[in-house]
Each structure stands twice: as structure tokens, then as C-alpha cells.
Amino acid sequence: MRFSFMSGGKGPTQGTGKRVAVIGSGPSGLAVAGYLASKGHEVTVFERLPLPGGVMVFGIPEARIPRERVLGGCKELEEVYGVKFRTSCKVSANGDLLLGDNLAKENIELQGVVDENDATIIATGTWNSRGLPAENATYKGIHSALEYLFRCKANELGLISRKERIKLGRNVAVIGSGLVAVDAAIEATAEGHNVRLISIEHQFDSPSGSYEIGRLKKKGVEHFERTVIKKVLGEGKVESVETIKVNAEIKAGVILKLEQIPGTEQIIEKVDTIIVGIGQVPTPPFNKEYRDIKTLRWGGIEVNDRYLSSKGKVFATGDITTGITKVGRAYQTGLKTAHWVDRYLQG
């Protein structure tokens, strides 16, 4: 997988003497790094996890994006374009603890990084998950899809032990029909679990696309569409769920209207694990008390049409500005951002 878009693999143009920091190494962060390094800028990528690649390495199943392709692209950036990767290094301004932060060996203040560079690009993505909006949502056996996938990948990479993976029961209900939910269903099915998918969308309205849901069905996954969990049943742990059919009006991934249909309640027996994949929340490298960089109501970083934030020489890109998207769109956003950063650095 190539991240060096501007020079055809020939290496960077003559150095500009400008220093750039990229915080986060998912698809948008790597697109920014590749573009700017190709233009001759000195780029350092800060990544809180032990390997670069973000969700492409620590979330998406191998069958969809082979991690070696991603790591190979990062190696090219390092060896051919001089990009420096500082992994296991969290950059923040009193930022909240995130999934995988325990693997970081170094913590650096955001302001110090901003001061030492001519431009800083925040590409920290969406690493917090939305909870299950149902009664008894705190019962044992309920997990986020992102954490489940992360622990699977971290174990495969030898970063955590097998015992630190999330242990699923025999019968799993995955909630949601976006790519994170679908990827969790793929992983759970591959592990040999009996998987059901429950979503408010019809198959043909699913954020992941009808094809992905169809693939799951061919693997034996039962899809309860236009359905939500009303109540988790059991004695302090998941044993079954009560569902209800819904009418939903959804536009651009936003639920505008959701009505439960009385009389359509159903008990799904023998559910001992619930994996929740109904959306993720932006995770900027600072908490709500940080006022230097403006955020939007939903938590993303506010940027102008050139991806510049409210703080001078600090840009933001990818899912931290748009909400969760597919890898291709995050890539494109990174390239657009890098174009404007390059223009900014040229004066």
C-alpha cells in the first residue's frame, strides 16, 4: 500500500527546511505524511500504539486490508522519504485515556509538538464507542466492537496475551450494520461463534453496503433488520434479549426519526454475548476543558475549508473532522488536507 503519492516512488524533492508533525497514523494521517514528505518537508508521525497504521492494523480484519501491505507502505515512507515514526508515543493536552493507551511508553505535551514544528496535523480518529441504548446495558457480556477487534489484532501481533482478548460466549449478537459491526461479525464467525446481526437499517440501507451484509448471510449470520434491542435479559449477565421492530428515517448516517412498532416485541433466546458497533466518537488529543482548539457539538475538531483549526498552524484531518468514514474517504480527506498544509508552508 503506497502512501507516497506525489513522486512516483522516486523519493522527495529538494528539502524545504519545514518541519511537520502528524499526530495519528491511520489512513488520513499516512496520506498527509506521504504527500508532505514527497514535497520535501521534514515529517514526523506520532503514534500512541506500537505500530503505525491505526485502525487498518488494529481493527480491520486481515482479509479486508492485509496489515503487511500497510506496514510495507510505512516502511517505504521511512526508508525512501525520510519520514520519522515515533510509535508508542502519545501526544495530548490532558487527553482522556483511550483504547490501547496502556501500550504507550512515552507521553508528550501537545503544545510542545506545536511549538517545535511549522505545522501540526491532528489525525487521531474515532477511538471511543457509543454504548448500547437499551435497558440493562451494563450487564456482563456486553462489549464494544472496536475493543473486541483491537484486542484480537493486538494479540495476533504479540502485544497482549491470549487471556487479554475478549472472551465471547457461544451465541453472539452484533449490534449495527456499519463496517465496524460487520468486521466484528466476520471475526466472531471466523472464531466459530454463532452470530446474529441486529440493526435498525434494512440490508439495502446498511452503512457497510448490501454486499457486506450478503456476505455475512452466506457465512450463516442471521440478520434481524429494522430491529433494536429493547432490553437485555438475564441475572446480571447477558442470557437473552428482547427486541422490537422500528421505523427509522436516516439521512447521511444520522437518525432523524426512530419509532418503535408496538406489538412487534420478540425474545431472542440463547444470547450470551453482545458486541456493540453502532458508532464511534471522535477522540481529539485533548479533553473538554482544553479551549485552544475549537470542537463541534458532536466532538469533532472544527476546521475551515482548508482544514485549518482555530489554533494557528494546527490542522486536522480524517474522521476527527468528519466522523467515522470508510478508509478510502479518510485517505482522500488526508490528501486534501496535505495540499493546503503544503500551500500554507510555502507561504
Predicted regions: what they are:
Residues 5-23, 28, 57-58, 89-90, ...:
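Ferredoxin-like iron-sulfur electron-transfer modules
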Residues 16-98, 130, 135, 179, ...:
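Beta1-alpha1 glycine-rich phosphate/pyrophosphate-binding loop at the start
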Residues 116-125, 272-278:
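Short hydrophobic core segments
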Residues 138-169, 251-324:
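FAD-site-proximal beta/loop scaffold in flavoenzymes
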Residues 2-14, 76, 85, 129-191, ...:
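Glycine-rich dinucleotide-binding loop and its adjacent helix/turn
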Residues 93-114, 234-266:
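Conserved beta-strand-loop-beta-strand element in the redox core of flavoprotein oxidoreductases
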Residues 320-347:
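A conserved FAD-binding loop/helix module that cradles the flavin
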Residues 215-218, 228-239, 247-249, 336, ...:
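Mid-to-C-terminal Rossmann-like scaffold of FAD/NAD(P)H-dependent oxidoreductases
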